[in-house]
Amino acid sequence: MPKRTKILDKNQLQQKVNRLAWQIYERNHMESEIVVVGIQNRGVELAKRISKVISSISDIKVIVATVSIDKDNPYDSDLVFNLTETDIENKVVVLVDDVLNSGKTLMYASSEFLTVPLVKLSIVVLVNRNHNRYPIKADYAKEI
């Protein structure tokens, strides 16, 4: 197995997570509740970290949810959420993934929210590669 290149150390990663959490809080400080939805696998871990920071800096109730998607063939399988539509209805939803590359995964995952009335849908990524082939953008991103 080839050796993986380490992009961020633990402290650098936490700095990026802290900044993302603060940005989300700053734009949603008037909300009483935020739903943070992580895309399996690494998006879920990032969502949990961001949620933990938001909870530590504010009184906003943060609900962490997950969505499972086949990233290689998203159109061939259904998305699997661990929340129902009524759990996210009329709330701020923050969709989280580790990397925005072509935009296919985030486009497919975000399409599920189009039939649900939301206060707002935002997208968060740790890395934005800017190779977009789909009309989707990250509202919050940390360039590495």
Question: Where are the regions that the model predicts?
Answer:
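PRPP-associated nucleotide enzymes
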Residues: 1-144
